[in-house]
Regions:
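Conserved glycine-rich cofactor-binding loop
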Residues: 16-17
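The beta1-alpha1 cofactor-binding region of Rossmann-like NAD(H)/NADP(H)-dependent oxidoreductases
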Residues: 60-71, 100
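Conserved mid-core segment of classical short-chain dehydrogenase/reductases
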Residues: 89-104, 147-150
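SDR active-site lid
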Residues: 160, 164-223
């Protein structure tokens, strides 16, 4: 159990599978008082409720539907920690016939969905003392791979937005966290052909718990992420995490 999680109310998008499901398990294990399992179909959260009981409360969120996000924020006024985990991945190289369509779809969910989540839940977090907003980005936010280039572009955009959210939300006392997993053992990882090098999803939750405790902005959950993070850290500390003043 972590004292900084004990009794807190957490909302996790994409909670019914993959990293999201693992995050629910992690926060329940760390004695969160309530975990809103945000899913597109409420029925998909039934196994989580069956396993964990009334601590898990299903709520409907589709990151492609801003109205559902606003409704969820109204239905969950007690949230202390928002974890925006849900996302989509298309395997599109830059010149593929489906590249533009893939990019439009991925931006709608991975970037615009982030913006809608932040706009809807920032007032909720402010009303509950600031709390934390955790965004699941990726190592591909910083290093692109041609086979799923449009996904990389959408996550790079989401990382840029997360940096801006950090600056804006600190004014209301909200701790913003940018999480950058490498290959993780999920359906999404399998679809990207990363099964052989994937690491357990539980690493992500453990790293987020540690990042919330330490006040970190960047979180590197797995071995590939830590390797990239080590190379990136000097730049991050001097540019990304620095308060830049006008010359």
């Amino acid at each position: 159990m972590s004292e900084h999680i004990n009794g807190k109310t957490v909302l996790i998008t994409g909670a019914n599978r993959g990293i999201g499901k693992s995050l629910v398990e992690t926060f329940v294990a760390h004695a969160a008082g309530k975990v809103y399992a945000a899913v597109r179909s409420l029925d998909s959260a039934a196994p989580l409720v069956a396993e964990h009981g009334e601590v898990v409360v299903p709520v409907a969120i589709d990151l492609g539907d801003p109205a559902s996000i606003s409704a969820a924020a109204a239905a969950a006024p007690d949230v202390d920690i928002v974890i925006n985990n849900a996302g989509v991945l298309e395997t599109s190289a830059p010149l593929d016939d489906n590249a533009v369509a893939s990019l439009e779809y991925e931006l709608k969910i991975n970037l615009y969905g982030l913006c809608h989540m932040a706009r809807a839940f920032a007032p909720v977090l402010a009303g509950n003392g600031g709390g934390a907003f955790v965004q699941l980005n990726s190592v591909v936010s910083m290093k692109a791979f041609a086979a799923f280039s449009t996904y990389c572009a959408s996550k790079a955009a989401a990382y840029s937005m997360t940096q801006s959210l950090r600056d804006v939300l600190r004014e209301q006392g909200t701790h913003v966290v940018s999480v950058h997993p490498g290959p993780i053992a999920t359906d999404m990882g399998d679809s990207a052909g990363l099964t052989d090098i994937a690491e357990p999803a539980s690493l992500v939750g453990d790293a987020i718990i540690a990042g919330l405790a330490s006040g970190a902005f960047h979180v590197w959950p797995d071995s590939m992420a830590r390797q990239l993070g080590g190379a990136y850290q000097s730049f991050a500390e001097n540019v990304v995490e620095a308060d830049m003043s006008e010359a």
